[in-house]
Amino acid sequence: MATSRQLREQIAAGRWDAALAALYGGSEEVLARQRSRYGAALEQFELYYGPGRQVQVYSAPGRTELGGNHTDHQHGYGLAGAVTLDLVAVASRNEDGFIRVKSRGFNKLDVIDLTEAEPQQGESTHSASLIRGIAEGFRAKGCDVGGFDAYTASDVLRGSGLSSSAAFEMGVAMILNTEYGCGLDAPALARICQFAENTYFGKPSGLLDQLTSAVGGVLFADFADPTAPKIEKIHADGVLPEGMTLCVTDTRASHSELTGEFAAIRSEMEAVAACLGGKVLGEVDEKRFWQELPRLREQCGDRAVLRAIHYFEENARTLAQRDALAAGDFAAFARLVEKSGHSSFECCQNVYCASSPKHQGLSAALAISQSILAGTGGAWRMQGGGFAGTIQAFVPDALVKRYCAAMEALFGPGCCYLLSLREQGTVRVM
């Protein structure tokens, strides 16, 4: 194992170029940026924890949701792809029983005393709760984990719908898994992260984000049994045809104050399920749902019913999207992407907050996307939890410059990201 200084020298000399190219692509421009980025992270580690420490460096990708908007928590299907935007973590094991994590862009150094296993007062919704919950998740599986010191630098946009939280969680989990020789597989790590987010952080999330960051590639998941979802990996290579670029636009409004809006989607879907004898919509007979619409409207209200309609139709679309990608039929996939986007807007109603109609960044981004991309073979939709954050578009290369310029005119320079899908999940890089 090398020291932080030795790794910086090796990176600058190009000795880790092959490992970086496998994650980010092999162009000299890309490699130069990643050499600089990794070197800076190692320098920051030394600043906070001192020089001369033996370290390992990890990468945890963000994800873009490709299908299955708000279906996973109802025990439906999900489809997502890992992307080249990621979190990089430099870590070194310690023997004092504390986990210390300093994250770029945040002033606070998280210090977790591992003798305090229970959720701590005032810690929920903060990164410290995730770290504590992940450590406890390992212990619940019989893993004897201890302390480490880490510095993280994330390019995954916070509150953007690219799942910065899952990347952070998976980075922490991979550090513990590697430094303490736990040997847990990627799905097990993802479940630990979900446990931490649900129980310690206090967010009722599904599992798709963590699974995609853990496994990489394009991931199709069946959550009929959410404790043991069936997953199928579609290799990222060839998913996007030649001449098509994945663009993600940050509308620069955060998800961070929207937990109540997200929770309402789940609670309303589950209210409909309860009227039909189930806990979630995945347990409900769809034919009976359509037959009992008048009663459901009366008992649950129209928005809840519309969100349930979205679930059933989106679930079927997600299965069709998987089949289209597996068959290499991007045109069919793109048509389904558009339908998914319209359903999120019209039925799930998670493109803007009804209580704040003056602020509709996602709506504006989708409208401009439609004006540019309609009839071109491209596609566009909102992604993630919704209400704010990012939209996703598949843009023909000939239109990328025009498309990005239009997005930047609305949301400012640097808002439009050109992404690639990433084959690797969360890994130790060096």
Protein language model annotation of sequence segments:
Residues 140-148, 176-192, 397-410:
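Phosphate-handling active-site elements
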Residues 160-248, 430:
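Fold-level recognition of mixed alpha/beta catalytic cores in primary-metabolism enzymes, strongest
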Residues 135-157:
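Glycine- and acidic-rich phosphate- and metal-coordinating loops
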Residues 53-54, 70-77, 116-124, 154-162, ...:
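A short glycine/serine-rich beta->alpha loop
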Residues 76-96, 215:
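Structural signature of FAD isoalloxazine-binding scaffolds in flavoprotein oxidoreductases
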Residues 59-75, 155-172, 376-394:
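Glycine/serine-rich anion-binding loops at beta->alpha junctions
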